[in-house]
C-alpha cells in the first residue's frame, strides 16, 4: 500500500528543528540554504530551486547480477538433476513470487498457490480509471530511492521507474490545510522543535539493540504508550498534534490511540542526528505502465508453477518432518505433502488456517494478534488538473476537513485530465467502505473543493474504491504495531519454525508495509531454502546481490540493531 509522504516532511522538520537548535541558525534560513521548496499560502510566489536526481542503481549491482546469473545457471542443472522434492510457496504477492523466482533461477522447483484468482496480492493497478486513459494504483504505489531490492528486481525484469520528483518539479509539494487555512513548512518546523528534541532523547534511551527478545526498560515503557498519549504529553502546538494524528493514521492505518509510540519514534526520528533533505522515505518512484507489471512479469516466468484460486485451509506436521497441507480449489478439497513450506500470506489471512504445527508462543501470538491497518483508497477523475494549472500544486494535501490525505495518481500520464487519490486510515479507512463509491466521492469532493476552489466543476467519470479491510484474503492494508506489540513481536514474524518459512512485508525488519519489504523478505526466504538444500553458491549469489543493494539502501524506518538482527541465525528451528 502507499505510505504517507507526510512522514518525509516530518522527518525533515525534525532534522531541521534539531540543527537549528544546535547551530543557532533560524529554521527558515536553513530551508533556504538547502533549497527546500516551501509550501506557500495562495498568492505567494514559489521557489524554483532545482532538486537533483538520485541514481536508481549504483555501482556493483550489475556485477552482482552477472555473478548471480552465472551461478544460478551452473547450480540450476545440479538441482534439477538431483530431483529434489518440491517446495510450496503460499501466496503469489511480491514476496512469494520473488522467492519462487529466485529459487527458479537456482533450478529449484517450487509450487506456488494463490487464494485469489489473480496474482499480485496487495499490488493492483487499475487501467483507464474514471473514464480516462490513466491507470491508478489501488494498492502498493510508491517506491523509495532506498528500496534497492525492488528497484533491482524491476530493472532485471526490463521495467522503468518514473521519477515523480522530476515530473512534479516546480509545483508546491505538500499543502497543509488545517483549521480552515494553509500552514507553511516554516510554521510547522518552528512548532515541531520541542517535540523533535524529546524524540531524540527518547530514541537514545531505547538503546542500540532492539528485538522482542532484547529491549530496555525505556523501550518497554514507550511501547506501552500510545502515540496519542505521547504527543499529548509533549510540549508542542495543537497544529502539530493534528498533523501527527493525520500522519500516523494514514501512515500505518490505525488511529493514534491504538498505535505504539515506538511507531512514531522509529519512523519520524530515524535520522534525527543527520541532515537529509528527504528523510529515509521519499516515495519518489513508480513503475512506468503500472506497478502490477512487476508481479505479472514474475508470474510469466513462473506460469507453470502457479495455481490461482487455491486456498490453504490447514497445515500439519507429519512424523517424518514433512508437512501435509489441506487445500481447496472451488468445490474440490485435497491434500498434498511438502518438505518445505514458505508462508507469505498476511497474518490476518493465516489466522483462518488450521495450523497443526507446534509453534513457539511469541510466533503464535504474532500470528494471532499483530495489528493491521485499515487504509483504503478512493480515486476520482477530472477533466483537467486545476490543482496544477491554477494552484501550482501536486494535489498532495494533509487536512482535518474530513478526508486525511490526497495526491495526484499517476501524475506522469501524458493526458490533460487527471486523477486524485483520497487515502484514508483508522476509523475513516473503515468508514470509506460504507455506501457506494459515488456516495463517498461526493463527500470527498465537497471537502477537496475547499482546498482547490473550482475543482468540483471538473469532476468526470465514476469513482473507484479500493477497500482493503473488506478483502477476504488480506482483511487490511499492511502490518501496524499496536500498543505493546513492538516488545512482544518485533523480529519474530520472519523467524522460521523447522522447515516452515515466513516472508512478506509484515516480516520485514526495516520496510514493513512497503513493497520493498515483501521483495526483500522473499529473497531472504529463498536464500534460507537454498542454504538448507546445500546450494551454497546460489545462496551466496543472491546474498551478493543483496549486499550490493544494502550498501546503498536507506531503510524506510531505522530500528536500533535491525541489521544485526537480520543477520543473526534464526532462534526458532
Residues of each region from the PLM?
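Active-site/ligand-binding neighborhood in enzyme catalytic cores
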Residues: 30-39, 211-314, 329, 337, ...
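C-terminal segments that line or cap access tunnels to active or ligand-binding sites in enzymes
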Residues: 338, 345-475, 545-548
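A glycine-rich dinucleotide-binding beta-alpha-beta segment and adjacent secondary-structure elements
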Residues: 455-507
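N-terminal glycine-rich phosphate/pyrophosphate-binding loop and immediately adjacent elements
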Residues: 81-206
